[in-house]
UniProtKB/Swiss-Prot annotation:
GO biological process, one term: arginine biosynthetic process via ornithine
GO molecular function ontology, one term from the record: argininosuccinate lyase activity
PANTHER family (alphabetical): ARGININOSUCCINATE LYASE
Keywords: Amino-acid biosynthesis, Arginine biosynthesis, Cytoplasm, Lyase
HAMAP family with a match to the protein in the record: Arg_succ_lyase
One Pfam family named in its UniProt record: Lyase_1
Any Gene Ontology CC annotation: cytosol
Name listed for the protein in its UniProt record: Argininosuccinate lyase
EC annotation from Swiss-Prot or TrEMBL: 4.3.2.1
Main location, first listed in the record: cytoplasm
Compartments (UniProt record): Cytoplasm
Length: 429
C-alpha cells in the first residue's frame, strides 16, 4: 500500500500501476534528493527542524540512490523518499521533512532542475555541432553546388555556404535556449500546494540552496504552471523540425541518383535481399524521431491546456513528453555530429549539376542589368536564350563573387567559418 493514502485504504494493484509515476520518476530522482537536501538544510537554518534531526536526515540522504527509491509500491518518488527516510530514522526524526513542503512545489522544482541538466547537455552538443559545421564549411568553402528551391536547381552556392546556414539555425536555437534556461532557473520551492506555507521559509535562500537563481513569485503559478516545460519543449522541437530539413537533404543527396553525399559506412545499413543497397538509416531514424518529438510536444500542450491553474495529476502525465523531446534531441544531435564528422561531399558532381542546370542565370541577368539594361528586359532575353539553348551564362567562379554580406561568396564563407573556429578554439568543448 502507498504511504500517504494508507489512511484511506488499499487501492489495488491495477489502480496503483495506472496512477503511479514511479517508472517515469527515474528522470528526476537525483533532483528530488537534491531538493530534499536543500529543504532540510533550510528548515534547520531557520530553527524549525531540530539540528540533530537535520544532521541525521542529511547524512542518510547521502546514501540514497535512485534504485532504492524507485519501488512500484509508491505513488511517486517523493512519497518513496519520505517513507525511505522514516524507515531508516523513525518518524520522530524523518517526520519533519513533510513540514513546509508539498509534492506540488517539490516536483516542479525537480522537473526544472532535471530539465536544466538535460538542456545543458543538449546545449553542449549543439555548440560542438556548430564547431564541426564551421570546420566543414571552411573545408568546402569553394565547393560549388546548386541550391534548391521547390526541389529544383536554383542559384549557385557552395556546400560551405549551405553548412553555415545550418550553423545559423543552431545559433538561433542556442539564443532561444538561453532565454528558456532563465525560466528554468526560477525556484517554485516554498510555494506549497498552491498558496504558500505557514512555515516561515525564506524562498530566496531556499532557492539558492537548491541551485536556482531566482524565485517564481506567485505560489499558485509556481506549483501549478508548466509554461517552462512548454517553452523548452517548443524551442527544442522547433530546432529539430528545422534540422530535419537538412537531414532530409542529406538523405536525398546520398542517393546515387544525386551522388553529392558519401555517407560513412557506420551510418548505413543494407537490404536483406538487395545486396547493393546502402540505406542511410541513422538519418532516417533522426527524421522520424524529429516528427515523433512534434507529437510529444502536441501531447504536452494538449494535457496542460485542459486543466485549471493548479496541480492535477494530469501534469504528471505531461512530464514524460518533455523528457522524450529532450532525450530524442540530445541523442539525435549526437548522431548528426558523428555523421558530419565522417561524411564527404562530391564537389565535382555538385559543380557539374550547377553548370548543367543554369544555376548562374540570376547572376547573369543581374550583371546585364547592372550594365544599364532594365532587369526585366534582361531577364526575358536570357530566358529566351536558355529555352533555345543559346544562352552564354556566367561561370560559377564569376557568379559566386557576390559582394553582399552573408552571400555564398567563398571569401564570405571562409571569413564566417574562420571567425567561428576561433571561438571554438578559445572555448574547447
Amino acid at each position: 500500500m502507498s504511504f500517504y493514502r494508507s489512511w484511506i485504504g488499499e487501492e489495488g494493484e491495477l489502480i496503483k500501476r495506472y496512477t503511479s509515476s514511479i517508472k517515469d520518476d527515474v528522470e528526476i530522482a537525483e533532483e528530488v534528493i537534491k531538493v530534499m537536501e536543500a529543504h532540510v538544510k533550510h528548515l534547520a537554518e531557520v530553527g524549525i527542524m531540530p539540528k540533530e534531526a537535520a544532521d541525521a536526515i542529511l547524512k542518510t540522504l547521502k546514501e540514497a540512490t535512485p534504485e532504492q527509491l524507485l519501488s512500484s509500491e509508491f505513488e511517486d518518488i517523493h512519497e518513496a523518499l519520505e517513507k525511505w527516510l522514516i524507515d531508516r530514522l523513525g518518524e520522530e526524526t524523518a517526520g519533519w521533512v513533510g513540514l513546509g513542503r508539498s509534492r506540488n512545489d517539490h516536483v516542479a522544482a525537480a522537473i526544472r532542475l532535471a530539465a536544466l541538466r538535460k538542456a545543458s547537455a543538449l546545449r553542449k552538443n549543439v555548440e560542438k555541432m556548430r564547431c564541426i559545421l564551421a570546420k566543414k564549411a571552411l573545408e568546402y568553402a569553394d565547393c560549388a553546388m546548386p541550391s534548391f528551391t521547390h526541389f529544383q536547381p536554383a542559384q549557385a552556392i557552395t556546400f560551405g555556404h549551405y553548412l553555415l546556414a545550418v550553423d545559423e539555425l543552431a545559433a538561433e536555437f542556442l539564443h532561444v535556449l538561453k532565454a528558456v534556461e532563465k525560466l528554468l532557473k526560477r525556484s517554485p520551492l516554498g510555494a506549497g500546494p498552491a498558496g504558500g506555507t505557514r512555515t516561515p521559509i525564506d524562498r530566496e535562500r531556499l532557492a539558492k540552496l537548491a541551485g536556482f537563481e531566482d524565485v517564481v513569485e506567485n505560489a499558485l503559478y509556481a506549483s501549478g504552471s508548466r509554461f517552462f516545460a512548454l517553452a523548452l519543449a517548443s524551442a527544442v522541437v522547433s530546432f529539430l523540425t528545422e534540422l530535419s530539413r537538412t537531414v532530409d537533404d542529406l538523405i536525398r543527396w546520398n542517393s546515387p541518383l544525386v551522388g553529392y553525399v558519401a555517407a560513412p559506412d557506420s551510418h548505413v545499413s543494407t537490404s536483406s535481399i538487395m545486396p547493393h543497397k546502402r540505406n542511410l538509416v541513422t538519418l532516417e531514424v533522426f527524421r522520424a524521431r524529429a516528427a515523433e518529438a512534434l507529437g510529444h510536444l502536441t501531447a504536452l500542450n494538449a494535457v496542460v491546456m485542459k486543466i485549471g491553474l493548479g496541480y492535477s495529476l494530469d501534469l504528471q502525465e505531461a512530464t514524460r513528453h518533455l523528457w522524450a523531446v529532450l532525450n530524442m534531441a540530445t541523442e539525435g544531435v549526437e548522431i548528426f555530429i558523428d555523421f558530419l564528422e565522417k561524411m564527404s561531399f562530391n564537389c565535382v558532381k555538385a559543380r557539374e549539376d550547377a553548370e548543367r542546370y543554369h544555376s548562374t542565370s540570376s547572376d547573369t541577368a543581374e550583371t546585364i542589368a547592372l550594365s544599364g539594361v532594365p532587369f526585366r528586359k534582361a531577364y526575358f532575353q536570357l530566358a529566351k536564350e536558355i529555352k533555345e539553348g543559346t544562352a552564354r551564362l556566367m561561370s560559377i567562379e564569376e557568379a559566386l563573387q557576390r559582394p553582399t554580406r552573408g552571400s555564398a561568396n567563398p571569401e564570405e564563407v571562409k571569413k564566417a567559418a574562420s571567425t567561428r573556429l576561433v571561438f571554438c578554439r578559445e572555448k574547447p568543448l
